[in-house]
A protein has these predicted regions:
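Active-site-facing alpha/beta catalytic cores
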Residues: 1-81, 85-92, 96-108
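Short, basic, helix/turn surface patches
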Residues: 4-21, 141-149, 207-219, 279-281
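Generic secondary-structure signature for well-ordered alpha-helical cores
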Residues: 8, 30, 53, 80, ...
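Electropositive, surface-exposed helix/loop patches at the edges of structured domains
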Residues: 14-32, 150-153, 157-162, 166, ...
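Generic secondary-structure boundary/loop-capping signal
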Residues: 36, 45-51, 57-58, 63-66, ...
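Short capping/connector residues at structural and topological boundaries
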Residues: 49, 53-56, 71, 205, ...
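Glycine-rich phosphate/ribose-binding loops and adjacent secondary-structure elements
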Residues: 61-217
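C-terminal extensions of enzymes
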Residues: 193, 220-281
Length: 281
């Protein structure tokens, strides 16, 4: 699993850092860029309070930034510190898709193993609607710009893209546009049990995922949900293999923009993907 290293530093222990497969420094999130978080006291159960070092029933405020990060040198030092503390685990940096080139300059200087970019199109149960619908760069343009920047500076840092990617065709297109990997959130929740009631923040999720209510949580069958997520991922992998075959490739990582077309003139203009009306000679 990927351990998310956030400003509040919840659950940051040597054991957790070293038992993770990778560590991701969360600088930003696509659906609420530049914001922290607020967990109302009514959701802070004894279990959550113990994990977060708070009192049960006490509001938990998450800061919007790491107080120790004020320069690119600070970010580089944090990457090095986590790499050492974790025993050499891969270290990533997650940013919201905003001032991409400027932010990527800082990230590349910090020398992480991967950079995750979260574009508009993603979701979370706790982001304000007005921000979710009006901020950050749409994922397709964010990916294109990021790939161009990393190529221009000859960086070999892996690029992970997320934000609204739901099914295997989305994943295949993202890989073709230059992503090394894709990350999902909502798609996995839907595979598990989510029926998109869109009331996550209320704590009254009727399928038992986003709630601390014992009666509602009892409705969530974890083993069955885990199997559904595994099925979704396995089917997605098989479908990605099919996309590779039908385009004449041995691997999905051989896909490129040459394998894509679009009906959208703006996408064609800004991403280099050919318009469907343009002859390929």
């Amino acid at each position: 699993y990927i351990f998310e290293y956030i400003p509040n530093k919840y659950s940051v222990t040597e054991e957790n850092l070293r038992s993770s497969d990778a560590i991701e420094i969360k600088i930003g999130q696509g659906t609420k860029p530049g914001m922290g978080g607020h967990l109302p006291g009514k959701k802070v159960t004894p279990e959550i309070a113990a994990l977060r070092g708070k009192k049960p029933g006490e509001d938990v405020q998450s800061p919007s930034k790491f107080p120790e990060l004020n320069s690119r040198e600070d970010l580089k030092a944090m990457v090095a510190m986590l790499r050492e503390r974790s025993g050499g685990r891969p270290i990533g940096i997650k940013i919201a898709a905003g001032h991409l080139e400027q932010d990527l300059e800082y990230c590349v200087f910090a020398e992480p193993d991967f950079i995750t970019i979260d574009g508009r199109g993603g979701s979370t149960g706790s982001s304000p609607f007005f921000l979710r619908e009006a901020t950050t760069v749409p994922t397709i343009y964010a990916l294109s710009r990021a790939r161009k920047y990393l190529d221009a500076v000859h960086s070999d840092i892996s690029l992970v893209i997320t934000g609204g990617l739901r099914v295997s065709p989305d994943f295949a297109k993202a890989l073709a546009m230059g992503a090394d990997a894709v990350a999902i959130g909502t798609a996995a929740l839907i595979a598990a049990a989510c029926q998109q009631y869109r009331i996550c923040g209320s704590g009254l999720c009727p399928v038992g995922i986003a709630t601390q209510d014992p009666a509602l949580r009892a409705r969530f069958k974890m083993e069955a949900a885990a199997q559904r997520v595994a099925n979704f991922l396995n089917v997605s992998r098989a479908e990605l293999e099919t996309f590779a075959r039908v385009t004449g490739h041995h691997s999905v990582h051989d896909l490129s923009t040459a394998d894509l077309i679009t009906l959208n003139r703006d996408i064609a203009r800004y991403t280099g993907i050919a318009h469907a009306g343009t002859p390929k000679l």
